[in-house]
From Swiss-Prot:
Species: Bifidobacterium adolescentis (strain ATCC 15703 / DSM 20083 / NCTC 11814 / E194a)
Taxonomic path: Bacteria, Bacillati, Actinomycetota, Actinomycetes, Bifidobacteriales
PANTHER family in the record: TRANSLATION INITIATION FACTOR IF-1, CHLOROPLASTIC
CDD domains per record: S1_IF1
Full protein name: Translation initiation factor IF-1
Gene expressing this chain: infA
HAMAP family, A to Z: IF_1
Length: 72
């Protein structure tokens, strides 16, 4: 359920950083800085390096994103 104007892409977590930030490598080898969405944080969904995730990115800043789903 993405918002209008939001870009959804898939990637793989490369590195876990402090303050629930992650470096994610997209399928096109671009690396972005991502945070966890509020619903994932509320439900205590853990994200580790090598996890496949779905990101929402704003068209205005393509270097940051929000992790909205973790594949099992």
């Amino acid at each position: 359920m993405a918002k209008d104007g939001v870009i959804e892409v898939e990637g793989q977590v490369v590195e876990a950083l402090p303050n629930a930030m992650f470096r994610v490598e997209l399928e096109n080898k671009h690396i972005v800085l991502a945070t966890i969405s509020g619903k994932m944080r509320k439900n205590y969904i853990r994200i580790l390096p090598q996890d496949r995730v779905v990101l929402e990115m704003s068209p205005y800043d393509l270097n940051r994103g929000r992790i909205t789903y973790r594949y099992k």
